[in-house]
């Protein structure tokens, strides 16, 4: 009897060893979600093996580094010629290569090039220590050049190497490195609220399906966040001002929804999310129904406030040929209506997220959203 038990145990162990030897590669669900949010076209290319993928000379270049930190970082960067070649090749891939949400108004070639430039930026900022566009609120956890920073970069390179068989990131080793660099810095802001509409905006999304938009003057009241400069303060004084303005405007009945936009930005390391705190205040202090509120908890700047709000309007099925209403405190309202804001949008986004229309009061401007706002841009990996 004992011999039979030993025999059965040995057989079970043998079967387990065989099963493990033939097991599928391990998929990191966090990495998969982050890569899909930041680099959807590159993920699609790796999944289908269609169009141009990573050039063979890149793999040779990386293999020659033997995991040496400076070499791996340098070899992982995409040259302009490589970006052009891969983007041009991607444009020739079958339409079935791409998910509907991957390709924006300017096409596959532009999207792939945008993602590769964004990938370079992640490696430069989080790997090489290049200053980000907004150094006061963005960038790695540790000071570039410090022992902690250098150690984190080395760890990221090893983590990326250990993940080379991850089926979600097969496009190129640089994609795994970029995600690893973000991961070791706990830079997961871009997916912190996903699935956003189904998990956090489900009530409003359901209501939008039965809305008769013609009954309203505006599709939504847009409220940009005003972050506090204090880590312990959930909502700034101007944020509270904006919430009151929103409540008054909603009570007029001219818009079916209030869209609250703002992430946890100021100061660096803040944990209170502007959109979430404003939603809480609207419900608890002013009695605005939850199903009339949409949160947009990713925008880190006024430019992306309007870009991301446009994305939420499109998700709601709101008509883009109808005005929405931006309501915010006077200084920010003046800024949104200024040539400086137009210039900043063109410089940072490459387009205007919509048309700024009539000024109705010192705190109110009309806004007509643009579908250009659907372009994913990982140049800001915390809010693409």
Regions found by a protein language model. Name each.
Residues 6, 23-24:
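Long acidic/mixed-charge intrinsically disordered regions
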Residues 14-22:
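Hydrophobic h-region of N-terminal signal peptides that target proteins for export
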Residues 12-13, 355:
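Residue-level detector of alpha-helical transmembrane segments in integral membrane proteins
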Residues 24-384:
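A structural signal for short, hydrophobic/glycine-enriched beta-strand patches
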């Amino acid at each position: 009897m004992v011999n039979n038990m030993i025999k059965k145990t040995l057989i079970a162990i043998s079967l387990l060893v065989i099963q493990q030897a033939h097991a599928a590669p391990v998929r990191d669900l966090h990495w998969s979600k982050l890569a899909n949010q930041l680099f959807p076209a590159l993920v699609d290319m790796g999944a289908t093996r269609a169009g141009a993928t990573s050039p063979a000379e890149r793999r040779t270049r990386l293999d020659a580094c033997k995991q040496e930190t400076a070499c791996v970082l340098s070899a992982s960067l995409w040259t302009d010629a490589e970006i052009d070649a891969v983007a041009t090749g991607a444009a020739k891939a079958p339409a079935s290569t791409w998910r509907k949400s991957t390709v924006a108004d300017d096409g596959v070639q532009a999207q792939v090039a945008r993602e590769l430039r964004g990938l370079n930026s992640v490696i430069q900022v989080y790997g090489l220590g290049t200053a980000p566009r907004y150094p006061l609120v963005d960038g790695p956890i540790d000071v570039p050049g410090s022992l902690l920073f250098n150690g984190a970069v080395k760890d990221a390179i090893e983590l990326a190497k250990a993940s080379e068989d991850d089926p979600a990131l097969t496009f190129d080793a640089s994609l795994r490195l970029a995600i690893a660099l973000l991961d070791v810095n706990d830079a997961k802001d871009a997916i912190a609220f996903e699935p956003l509409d189904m998990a956090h905006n489900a009530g409003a999304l359901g209501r939008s399906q039965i809305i008769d938009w013609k009954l309203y003057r505006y599709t939504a009241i847009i409220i940009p966040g005003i972050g506090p400069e204090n880590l312990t303060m959930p909502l700034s004084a101007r944020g509270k001002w904006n919430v009151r303005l929103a409540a008054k405007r909603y009570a007029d009945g001219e818009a079916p929804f209030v869209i609250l936009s703002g992430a946890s930005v100021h100061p660096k390391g803040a944990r209170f999310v502007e959109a979430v705190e404003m939603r809480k205040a609207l419900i608890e202090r002013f009695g605005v129904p939850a199903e009339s509120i949409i949160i947009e908890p990713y925008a880190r700047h006024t430019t992306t406030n309007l870009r991301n709000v446009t994305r939420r309007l499109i998700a709601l099925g709101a008509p883009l040929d109808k005005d929405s209403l931006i309501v915010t405190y006077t200084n920010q309202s003046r800024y949104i209506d200024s040539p400086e804001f137009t210039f900043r949008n063109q410089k940072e986004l490459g387009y205007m997220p919509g048309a700024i229309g009539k000024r109705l009061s010192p705190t109110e401007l009309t806004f007509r959203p643009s579908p250009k706002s659907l372009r994913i841009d990982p140049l800001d990996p915390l809010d693409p």
